[in-house]
Structure formats: structure tokens, C-alpha cells
Amino acid sequence: LTLAIHYVLPGEEKLTVLQSLLSRLKILNFTFGVLYLDKAFAAGSILDYLTQSEQPAVIACPIRGKRGGTRALCQGRKSYRTDYTFTDGTPANLAMVATLVPNKSGKRRRKWLAYIVIHLPWKTQKIYGRYRRRFGIECSYRSMRQVRAHTTSRNPALRFFQLAVGLVLVNTWVFLRWEFARLIAPGPRWVDPRRFRFHRFTRLLIRAVEKLYGSVMSIQTQVLPESVIY
């Protein structure tokens, strides 16, 4: 579900964007345990704000530098946690996760991932596993692109509005599937995803629009059909 979006103006600080989204969640009375942020929010002002707010968070940290910087922490064979001070003087606790990923030839090579950890006692593997779940957000964006309206207009407000409508449609599908595709069984609620896939939802939307506005079944042409039909 997408609970809040923010129209980012040129030059707007990332901390302002984050505070706007968090205030919207507060209005909705939505509570959460841990905040997961991508690399764009790995800034000193955001770290200070979350630390002072005592908000548990995991933030992806870019690995920079050739030998120094956070790249100097990419040593050894095992994952670990360590304290680190950024160039702007902001202290942070980092989880350095060593992963093995295959290259083009199929050989597995070591790849380091860095996460800024705030008010969490978790081990590195738990941090890595929980943050990976965040990639489900990307799936909602891919679904949104299937139902958003497309335009050649360069008006950013119009584009933002169409994006918002697409996200509302995805939220609608999530709600309908949660209510009508659930399994009737004791215990916690489970959903059978095969009963109402997103593709079927989009087909139903198309049919509803065609029923409301009609559909085009022919085109004007100056060529007789008999001349091209054999």
C-alpha cells in the first residue's frame, strides 16, 4: 500500500520531504516499528533527526571512496557492525554485509553492502534480510506503471497527478484482493493471489471504461478491404 506521497520542489531538503511523509502517517494514525530508507536519505540531517526522535531505522548507505571512506570498511570475509564518522562529522553505526553474487561468467564474487542502523540491536543478517523485503515497494511501482495515464505534457503537476491516480488504483486492487480473495479458514487471514491477479484487475478496468465510453472497432481508410484480403 502507498500511504503518502510528496511533491518534491526544486531545492527542497530531503529532511523536509521525510518530515512531510511522517506527518501524513501521523494524521492517518499509522504506527510502524522500523523505518527503511534508500540511499538518497543517507544524509547527516536525517540521521540526527531520527536519532533524536528515537525512531528505529535502517538506511542504505552508499559505498564511496577508492581506498578511504566507507570503502575502507569493506574488508574481511564476514559481515560485521561498526561505528563510523562521516566527513561532515555525523557519527553513525554501520552494518557491513558481505554477500556473494555471481558475475557474468557465473563465478561468485564478494559484494559489500552498507546500512546505517539507528536504535536497533539486530545482527547483520537480520538487517540484510529485513531490508530486502523493502524491494516489494518496487513491485508496486511496476504495477502502477501499468495503470497510470500517459501524456506528452511537460507539466510536472499533471504528471504527478497521473502518478497519484495510478497509485490509488493499485491501492484499490490491494484492498479488493484483501477483502474478496481471502481464504476462509481459522487463524490469521490469508489471501489466495491466484483468485484476483493484477492483470485481471487491469482487464476489468479496461472493460469498464469501454462500457462507459464505448470502444473503437474500425478506422477510416481509402483502401478497399478486398484489395488486401486474399
Protein language model features and the residues they cover:
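Acidic, metal-coordinating catalytic cores used for nucleic-acid/nucleotide bond scission
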Residues: 36-44, 63-65
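A short, flexible helix-boundary coil/loop motif
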Residues: 73-101, 146, 165-230
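Short active-site oxyanion
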Residues: 32-34
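Short, surface-exposed basic-aromatic patches at helix termini and helix-loop junctions that form
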Residues: 23-28, 47-56
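An anionic, glycine-rich sequence signature occurring as long contiguous blocks
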Residues: 53-144
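Short, solvent-exposed helix-loop connector elements
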Residues: 122-131, 143-163, 180-184
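Electropositive, glycine- and tryptophan-enriched low-complexity nucleic-acid-binding patches
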Residues: 1-30, 111
